[in-house]
Regions:
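C-terminal helical/coil "lid" or tail adjacent to the Rossmann-like core of SAM-dependent
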Residues: 203-252
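Conserved catalytic/acceptor-binding region of the Class I
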Residues: 125, 139-209
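Conserved class I S-adenosyl-L-methionine
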Residues: 1-41, 56-60, 79
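Short glycine-centered segments of the SAM/dcSAM-binding site in methyltransferase folds
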Residues: 46, 138-139
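Core SAM-dependent methyltransferase catalytic element
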Residues: 258-269
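Class I SAM-dependent methyltransferase SAM/SAH-binding core
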Residues: 48-50, 54-102
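A short SAM/SAH-binding and catalytic strip from SAM-dependent methyltransferases
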Residues: 110-124, 146
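Conserved helix-to-beta-strand junction in the class I
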Residues: 129-136, 143
Length: 269
């Protein structure tokens, strides 16, 4: 549960670009809305937003559930600064930390949400911690993108790569391949064992496919300032990105995400 310092540094640097990405592309609000759809309409009280980023999920939650309050947990202070601005005047608490430090704040909530963030956590300690926060009868709702769930991990969403490679060939420049580790997807056995051990019951599971413009993948990659070509002049980079978006125009590919709703039932077994 302890945040990886390197990942935190990456998202610190990306915070403004990530906020712009969330504003430009509706996929993030779709994911958050569909996750919130799983919660009962009568929900009232504090709701934990795990890996809250720039506060989009909490903003949607508070608009839909006027008797809830948001507790945003996010290890990137730069992200939380943006979230504070996005949620100004709303009933929200901001904690710059990982879920591992929840005990320090004696947190209690009627539900927890994790949109596009549960993949960063080990499920066993995560549910152990949530069992101390969520009272019996409370809820945990989270989603996993295709490559973070074993049953969809073979799906691909890399249309951006084809158009980027094409543009770089036109320009006779090398496409900068960003370093990345192949994610280890969560497994059903892992989820079942961790949740049941700490008193959570799986109530529902939904797999969603969102037809998503390839331009979204382009902008996601472009949060890295050395993409698509490392070390090029700003005006060259801008021209390359414009051309990539031209080639991506009108092209869609499915973004697959699986969402889960669990309920806290017992003290664990």
């Amino acid at each position: 549960l302890i945040p990886d310092p390197e990942k935190v540094r990456v998202w610190e640097a990306r915070a403004p670009a990530y906020d712009r990405l969330c504003r430009r592309w509706e996929i993030f609000s779709q994911l958050s809305n569909h996750l919130i759809d799983l919660l009962p309409a009568s929900l009232q009280g504090p709701v934990l937003d795990i890996g809250a980023g720039a506060g989009l999920t909490s903003k949607i939650l508070l608009a839909r559930y006027p008797y809830c309050q948001a507790i945003l947990i996010e290890p990137s202070e730069a992200m939380l600064d943006i979230a504070r601005a996005n949620l100004a005047g709303r009933p929200a608490k901001f904690l710059a930390m990982g879920l591992d430090r929840a005990a320090e704040h004696d947190l209690h909530a009627v539900a927890a949400l994790a949109s596009a963030s549960m993949q960063f956590l080990d499920l066993e300690p995560a549910f152990a911690t949530l069992a101390r926060i969520i009272a019996p009868g409370g809820y945990v709702a989270f989603n996993l993108w295709w490559h973070h769930w074993e049953e969809t991990a073979k799906r691909a969403m890399e249309g951006w790569r084809d158009v980027a490679e094409s543009v770089c060939r036109e320009a006779q420049l090398p496409l900068h391949v960003l370093p990345s580790r192949t994610p280890i997807p969560k497994t059903r056995i892992e989820l079942t064992n961790a949740s049941r051990r700490h008193g959570f019951e799986l109530l529902s599971e939904h797999r969603d496919e969102y037809p998503t413009p390839i331009g979204f993948g382009v902008d996601f990659q472009a949060m890295e300032p050395n993409w698509p070509v490392k070390g090029c002049a700003p005006e060259v980079r801008e021209a390359l990105l414009t051309r990539i978006h031209e080639l991506a125009q009108g092209k869609l590919e499915p973004l697959v995400s699986t969402r889960f709703l669990l309920q806290r039932t017992t003290e664990g077994r």
